[in-house]
Amino acid sequence: MVLSLTQGLDFSPAPFSVGLDKWSSSTGTTSTDTYDIVGEAVYVPVDQDFAGCIKMVKTYDVQKLRYTGQTDLPRETYLMIKTRVKRMAGGIPAIRIAGHAIDTNDTHVDAVTAYGPTGSLTDLGEIYEVTAIVGPGLRDGVDMVWGALPHYGHFGIDITGPTGAVVRIDDITIEDVSHIFQRDALNIVDVRDYGAIADGVTDNYNAFVAADNAANGRRVIVPTGEYAISQSLSISSHVEFQGTLVMPESAALLLTKSYDLPTYIDAFGDEAEGFKKAFQALLNSSDHDSLDMGGRTVTVSEPIDMQAAVSTRDTFTQRRVIRNGQFYASGSLGWEPTIVQGQASYSINASRDLTNVENIADIEVGSLVEGAGVGREVYVTSKDVSGGSIRLSKPLYDAAGYQLYTFTRHKYLLDFSGFSTLSKLNLQNIEFQCKETANAVMLARVGLIFHMIDCFIKQPKYRGITSIGTGCQGMLIDRCHFVTAEAQTNATDRVSLGLNANNNDVKLRDNWASQFRHFALLAGSNNIITGNHFYQGDGVQGGARLAGIILTKAATSSSIVGNYVDNCFIEWTNEHDETPDFTSGFGFSSLSISGNNFLSGAVAPWFNYILIKPYGTNHGISNLSVTNNNFRSINGSISRVEWVDTTYADINRSRLEAILFEGNNFENISRATQNPLIVEHTQSSANSVWTLETNNELPFQSYAKRVTALAPQAQIKTSSNSAYFDIPYTTGQVGSDKDQVKLTFGTLVKGKMAVTVRRD
């Protein structure tokens, strides 16, 4: 404790001007001679160097000068005794600080160091400063270690060397310097003790390195002020920032033992800047795989360019984690989308490129592309300004030629699009408070296994998670909440999207999403969507609903299992196919929809839960499995659960194969779709040909291709009521709509038959 500050103690002796009777020629104790008597010293009131001093003639081997007053020595207190002297005449003496230790019984303590370092007064008239530190502990810099026994002391100087020298001595001062040694006691190191200057300009790199090297397990303290650091700095000690750092954008601060966001915020005095520097360190150090935000909120007034924060690299493929915090969008000016329009050419021979692009310099990478023949969620992945071309995230289904496009660049709290490749990045337990002004996360152009876990995306203006390239390959979204900013907006008027993905192997698991225009658009294959609840209702009675999940690859090879599909539907398209007409391949194929709860309320009767929308002709459907789902409509019924949107084209119903529609439950659904479909037929009047209706209960009102089983429900009888035992043969695809089957008997018969009909 610095008692001179906390208790107002003044340890300095009385100045010489008070009188030489305060100054002993011996130990300073009672009854010793003072200089007003012995006469080797006189007071000099005016000196060109000292405000007032004494002139002393050295007459003894050790000429002593001690203050007769008692200088207290509180516990854990360190005192610096200091004066200035100059030789006026005579031989060259030496000088040192000295003291006489006394205990609580007013007894001399002799087992202590009685004096400090000695210095010679070599040059006539030259001012020499002599100092010594006295204190209880054996610490670096303590000259006179007195331990715990002394209670007070009589301090002054000794003059040694040849007699006859004449010296002048300035007033002796005693200063409490305990704070220097309290750093040792408190296990801290102050960077200022190693040359750091808090002026915001002087380069303090070497001082910080020296303090870190000297810490040896202690904590490094950066006191109040602004410290410039010119290059990347690594501190291996624990560190505490009371002041702030000024560093170039390219210089990284690596805090190996204090690596957390609160420390970086303290280091840079700003939440956003602290986060940028912490992320820069995360990608420039192998000491940590995760950045703990410490529950802090980072207020963001403009998008954070995550690659610019790192600056020195645009590729990173090792696992890194950011966890446990919140990003809060502030203000509005930094979040307004940039909108550019321009003509451009498109050819299916270069299906991912726009060429001859107008205003290309103003079009930003990551812009959403809109125009005639452009599918949903197509983005600018890269651009070549000199060549006038733009690379697209997906092909366009009907845009051949030269036309006008609109390019809209939305702004994101965390924007990773500057990375050419970024893989294995995890975001855990983070809340993105978009505040209806910002969007949440834009992914890198290329990357693997982006993973978002237990995060909240709240009120994004347009987008939650956006992929502009293939940075979504293998993306995992687990246990996240997507909260709309459009709860009071009618479903068909909403503009926000929870997330999109362009590449394959995406997994959406156990998420919750409320009242977006769409929850997710997935343009790749091999997706797994399980355990999610996505709700998109509104207050419009008999209103329309939009897709919750959109699959835009015809050969999707995906599974949708165990979800709660609430007032929305699953839409399956091929809008990202540059040749949308079917010519070869699988067409719409390989989709499993199983064990889901489908619910709608107060919707239009033509609403459906599963919608296929071909953007080209002649497509079939194959390897579709819709099993063990609950389909329920409340506050009104709907006609059927599945449908084909024929805006651009219908499906080719002769090409429906391997379709399984069974084990589903239907409530308030007029047509309970099944395949295989069991049809019960009663033939009241005898006839050799029975025609059976499927009542549009085969999937997608498809053809009744064949009968796979027959089971008489009562005895088949002839017109004369004789029993008939022969088996009829069957004919499929009967009638103008090919949705009937025929049973042909060898004679006129009547009765009741259960028939299993399949489309495939």
Residue ranges and their predicted role:
Residues 170, 243, 290-295, 318-329, ...:
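Right-handed parallel beta-helix
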Residues 34-64:
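Short carbohydrate-recognition loop motifs
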Residues 130-167, 172:
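Extracellular beta-strand ligand-recognition surfaces/modules
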Residues 247-284, 298-316, 324-400:
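Autoprocessing Asn-cyclization modules and mimics
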Residues 254-281, 303-311, 335-338, 349-353, ...:
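Extracellular beta-strand/beta-solenoid scaffold signature
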Residues 175-206, 245-246:
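Right-handed parallel beta-helix/beta-solenoid
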Residues 60-97, 130-132, 172, 694:
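Extra-cytoplasmic beta-strand recognition segments
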Residues 673-760:
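Extracellular attachment/recognition segments
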